[in-house]
Amino acid sequence: MTLVSDAMIFAACAHDGMLRKGTNVPYIVHPAEVAAIASTLTDDPEILAAAVLHDVIEDCGVSGQELAQRFGARVAALVLSETQERCGDPRMTWEARKRAAIAQIARGDRASKIIALSDKLSNMRAIRRDFERDGESVFARFHQHDKRRHAWYYRSCASLLKDELGDTDAWRELNEHIGHVFSEDDAESCLQEAAYAG
């Protein structure tokens, strides 16, 4: 069994019974799509394994030590680079967690940025599909209901990923989805909020 297929089986077991927010879609569809997107950017099996495992620490209670023992230290480190800490009321901590995630992207190497781009693109594909069907109500399924804050987060991520990966089809697709879902007004409002808060 290859590292990537072993990681896929592990992730499928870890996410068993979980659904994507506000849908009946099995959660494993998301990490599988993240790995598929990452495979257009690299053939490194450790990056692809980490891509499919990227949510198992954050969402499934798997430890970094367990991942390191099973898949190696680099895979575990890459998954940890994609892991957002949660504490207390998620609505109270959303912005702090997203700021930490943005900081992780900023200091990450190319491997971690490939996973971050793949994750954000998978998420934006789902948001766009649901936005086109359900409109603004799509944001009610998230802990953070304010569309402008999501605009700030995804635009910030795309901006940080541009230098390393802006010449890729994946980045261009991410940027196109962001432009479609989030108007310039949403982004401008969020920039003003961030400047005021900063």
Where do the protein language model's features map onto the residues?
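Active-site helical microenvironments for divalent-metal-assisted chemistry
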Residues: 1-198
